């Protein structure tokens, strides 16, 4: 997530709200990802396989991804036919179109979904979007609904808070959002128990918290004692895991690479999950548009950027690669790619949560315990994740700024302002046609998005340094235009006319956070949420992507179908249906600008009234007063 007005954001820690939402369906979560790390959170030395791991060039997709895509295409083809059985396009048989072109998969739509950063706000708003897109959600396949879009997608990417959502879904059985919205104590997504408190274990909370801190400390100490550098990101990642993966012990043995070993993923029954982080070069403090953008997929860790242009086998992170191979006198390492550490890496800005321990209401003795845990961690390492040994050591020596470094430093995936994880989805090798970009960024004074993330990705594509490596992205207007023209108040399509882009580029369906039934603009740094706040924010996220169950536009689901088909219709030289032309007229950015400074952006709910995360009318002075009172307390 991005760094914006931290003082104001921290002040927002105080604001909570009570808002109504239907009870989620209670579904038992069954763990599917494999707890396959040899020694819990501690990376372990193992024998290398007969074919020793190597770093490969990013000139193509990996053989694993290529093979998986062949299987996934069959699943998405079937899912799209189901989707278009309830998403109707007037005077056009969309399901029949998919069926007629199913023998040539390159003709068919290729869909990506990207969930932005923004802390718990992004997780919950993004969860509402995924809930709306999931055909397993009750009533999501009714008229005007978008259920089945998730099943039709090839890729699902997350960044920072969005990575918590993606990780939580995939490690918990590619489960439904309804199942994660449990009301049972001691389970996942119990955000009323903050990171500082830990899960409710059924005892006195102080005792539960003491056990929680001790277990986190022991896990990180095990990694440190094994010779691996640790930072606050390790503690942050372990704490996250209790909320996102396993409330009992935080799932210390679950790895990101284990997703690729599960039967359901090998059968391509779900989209491919991708998590994004930024590289921080030696001696660098600020992350620029030239930063290398790394991805974690189920098989690999690496980047398409020309600086490194390589991928390492994820399962063997922690192994001492040198020049792209493992020296004959070195063993391999497994267990470094802990799920919590991966999610923590993508959200290192939230290390600030842990640094606020003295401002919490926890007993002094617990504060002292946790302060002792953190005392040996230098201030300069507060916001990084340390990947040592550096997998790209002496790899791409002429272009890789970290090639001579024994340690690779990674930071929050939104620190370069690209707060929507579009980077993996716009790579030409992946041939994505349309990206549904869910934006929960806190760009404005009151924590609403204004298109900054899209602007950053567009500007990067034009960067004269060549960091974009030939990737193309649709033209995006400036942030003032977003606000002045209301492009951040409703869905907007970018890249509708593919002939206007410099190269193959997906159509972007921009889905900005907006108050339909709840003020979902919570401060990025608010650490806890009532169950009502959680559920109402998820419900609002559902409304964001369905436009209030199509109440703002009765043809919205049809227009989504048109966006999905757009690039495919071009490839097959199929006439665009008249209703789709009307959709594009309504939702495509027309290229006009209004860059004058806008008035303050304070949207209000447009359906049922609700309480808010940050009340639009509250003044900055009032926020400062409350913040001062909180710090004194």
Swiss-Prot record:
CDD domains documented for this protein: cPLA2_Fungal_PLB
One cellular component term from this protein's GO annotations in UniProt: cytosol
Keywords per UniProt: Cell membrane, Glycoprotein, GPI-anchor, Hydrolase, Lipid degradation, Lipid metabolism, Lipoprotein, Membrane, Signal
Catalysed reaction, written as an equation: a 1-acyl-sn-glycero-3-phosphocholine + H2O = sn-glycerol 3-phosphocholine + a fatty acid + H(+)
GPI-like-anchor amidated serine lipid sites: 609
GO MF, one annotated term: lysophospholipase activity
Enzyme class per UniProt: hydrolase
The keyword Signal is annotated on this UniProt entry: yes
Pfam families reported for this sequence: PLA2_B (PF01735)
EC number annotated for this UniProt entry: 3.1.1.5
UniProt-listed GO biological process terms: glycerophospholipid catabolic process
Function field: Catalyzes the release of fatty acids from lysophospholipids.
Name listed for the protein in its UniProt record: Lysophospholipase 1
Species the sequence originates in: Aspergillus fumigatus (strain ATCC MYA-4609 / CBS 101355 / FGSC A1100 / Af293)
């Amino acid at each position: 997530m991005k760094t914006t007005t931290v003082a104001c954001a921290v002040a927002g820690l105080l604001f909570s709200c009570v808002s109504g939402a239907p009870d989620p369906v209670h579904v038992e979560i069954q763990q599917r990802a494999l707890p396959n790390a040899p020694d819990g959170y501690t990376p372990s030395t193992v024998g290398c396989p007969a074919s020793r791991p190597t770093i490969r060039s990013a000139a193509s997709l990996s053989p694993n991804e290529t093979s998986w895509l062949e299987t996934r295409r069959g699943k998405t083809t079937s899912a799209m036919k189901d989707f278009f059985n309830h998403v109707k396009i007037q005077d056009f048989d969309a399901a029949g179109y998919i069926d007629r072109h199913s023998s040539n998969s390159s003709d068919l739509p290729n869909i990506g979904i990207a969930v932005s950063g923004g802390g718990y706000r992004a997780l919950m708003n993004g969860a509402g979007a995924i809930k709306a897109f999931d055909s397993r959600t009750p009533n999501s396949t009714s008229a005007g609904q978008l259920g089945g879009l998730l099943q039709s997608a090839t890729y699902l990417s997350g960044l920072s808070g969005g990575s918590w959502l993606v990780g939580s879904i995939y490690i918990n059985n590619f489960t439904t959002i309804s199942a994660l919205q449990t009301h049972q104590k001691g389970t996942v997504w119990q955000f009323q128990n903050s990171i500082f408190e830990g899960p409710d274990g059924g005892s006195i909370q102080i005792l539960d918290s003491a056990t929680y801190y001790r277990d986190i400390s022991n896990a990180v100490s095990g990694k440190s004692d094994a010779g691996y550098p640790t930072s606050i990101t390790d503690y942050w990642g372990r704490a996250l895991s209790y909320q996102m993966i396993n409330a009992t012990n935080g799932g210390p043995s679950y790895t990101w690479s284990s997703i690729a070993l599960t039967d359901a993923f090998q059968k391509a029954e779900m989209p491919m999950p991708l998590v994004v982080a930024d590289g921080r070069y030696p001696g660098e403090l600020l992350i620029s548009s030239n930063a290398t953008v790394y991805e974690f997929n189920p098989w690999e860790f690496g980047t398409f950027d020309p600086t490194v242009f390589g991928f390492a086998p994820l399962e063997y992170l922690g192994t001492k690669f040198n020049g792209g191979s493992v020296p004959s006198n070195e063993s391999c390492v497994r267990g470094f790619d802990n799920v919590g550490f991966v999610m923590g890496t993508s959200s290192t800005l939230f290390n600030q949560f842990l640094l606020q321990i003295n401002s919490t209401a926890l007993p002094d003795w617990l504060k002292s315990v946790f302060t002792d845990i953190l005392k040996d961690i230098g201030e300069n390492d507060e916001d990084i994740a340390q990947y040592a040994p550096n997998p790209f050591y002496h790899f791409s020596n002429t272009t890789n700024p970290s090639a001579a470094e024994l340690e690779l430093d990674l930071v929050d995936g939104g620190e370069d302002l690209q707060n929507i994880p579009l980077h993996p989805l716009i790579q030409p090798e992946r041939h994505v046609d349309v990206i549904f970009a869910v934006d929960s960024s806190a760009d404005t004074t009151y924590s609403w998005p204004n298109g900054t993330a899209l602007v950053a990705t567009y500007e990067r594509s034009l960067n004269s340094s060549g960091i974009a490596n030939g990737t193309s992205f649709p033209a995006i207007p400036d942030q003032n235009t977003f606000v002045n023209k209301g492009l951040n108040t409703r869905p907007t399509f970018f890249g509708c006319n593919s002939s206007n882009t410099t190269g193959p580029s997906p159509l972007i369906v921009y889905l900005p956070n907006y108050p339909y039934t709840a003020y979902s603009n919570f401060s990025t740094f608010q650490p806890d949420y009532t169950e009502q706040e959680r559920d109402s924010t998820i419900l609002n996220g559902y409304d964001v992507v369905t436009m209030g169950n199509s109440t703002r536009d009765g043809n919205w689901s049809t227009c989504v179908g048109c966006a999905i088909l757009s690039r495919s219709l071009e490839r097959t030289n199929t006439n665009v249906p008249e209703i789709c032309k009307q959709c594009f007229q309504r939702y495509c950015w027309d290229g006009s600008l209004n860059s004058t400074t806008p008035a303050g952006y304070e949207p209000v709910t447009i359906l049922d009234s609700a309480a808010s995360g940050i009340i639009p009318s509250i003044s900055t002075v009032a926020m400062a007063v409350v913040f001062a009172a909180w710090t004194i307390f």
